[in-house]
Amino acid sequence: MAGHSKWANIKRQKERVDAKKGKTFAQLSRAIIVAAKHGIPDPAGNFQLRTAIEKAKAAGIPNDNIERAIAKGAGTYENDDTVYEEIRYEGYGVGGVAILIEAFTDNRNRTAADLRSAFNKNGGNLGETGCVSWMFEQKGVVRIEGNIDENALLEASMEGEADSYELYEEDDDQAAEVFTEMTNLDTLSQTLNDKNFNVTEVELRWIPNNLIYIENDEQAKSIIKLIEALESLDDVQNVTTNFEMADELMLLTVES
């Protein structure tokens, strides 16, 4: 889990100074639309919707926009017949790095063409469904921040039936990610909240079963460039890979 978590944390730091706020708003709004469409349009009884709303609020999306997205998903918003669907795409980057892409789109052909172009321009290949998904397992992840007592975290994790956790230091602040089975995510999140941990993010995440270690500078630059190209597409919600590289190489690549 460490490799993917490292990249996720670096992305999180980049997003704090990312100028593409409009794209972030669009992504989060689409996540709300799809969550409301797949379940009841009430966050109290729809965990996926509640999580999407929490992320949207954390990003500063106005309540009016959130309510409008819920209405679109529920089919009660007037003058809007746009239908979004959730699709997973799969492919490879340089060095055989496996890549999973989760997208929300109203046009499959457009999304596939955009993804194929991004792969081709950055040394990768868009593959068939199932070509890499077997290399990953979907887990629930709860992120906490603030002063963290590891003994208290261990006790809470066991009570919430977590599988494992990882501690981090970010900008002189403590953080941790706690992993669990998909079906236990709501329970774990509530347990950590009840134990007075500062829960800042709750999500489902694809975790690689095995990692590919990248040591070559050019390969590292190529895979990061491909990931950023994929993430820049409006229809793309999440990109997950199975690479690992040294901290120094990853930071150098991200900053270049």
From Swiss-Prot:
GO terms for cellular component: cytosol. The keyword Cell membrane does not apply. Transmembrane segments: none annotated. The keyword Transcription regulation applies. Disulfide bonds: none annotated. Keywords: Cytoplasm, DNA-binding, Transcription, Transcription regulation. SUPFAM superfamilies: YebC-like. One of its GO terms (biological process) is regulation of DNA-templated transcription. It is found in: Cytoplasm. Gene3D superfamilies: 1.10.10.200, 3.30.70.980. GO terms for molecular function: DNA binding. It holds the Pfam family Transcrip_reg. InterPro entries: Integrase-like_N (IPR017856), TACO1_YebC-like_2nd/3rd_dom (IPR048300), TACO1_YebC_N (IPR049083), Transcrip_reg_TACO1-like (IPR002876), Transcrip_reg_TACO1-like_dom3 (IPR026564), YebC-like (IPR029072). It comes from the Bacteria. PANTHER family: TRANSCRIPTIONAL REGULATORY PROTEIN YEBC-RELATED (PTHR12532:SF6), TRANSLATIONAL ACTIVATOR OF CYTOCHROME C OXIDASE 1 (PTHR12532). HAMAP family: Transcrip_reg_TACO1 (MF_00693). Belongs to the TACO1 family. This is Probable transcriptional regulatory protein cce_0894. It comes from Crocosphaera subtropica (strain ATCC 51142 / BH68). The lineage of its organism: Bacteria, Bacillati, Cyanobacteriota, Cyanophyceae, Oscillatoriophycideae.
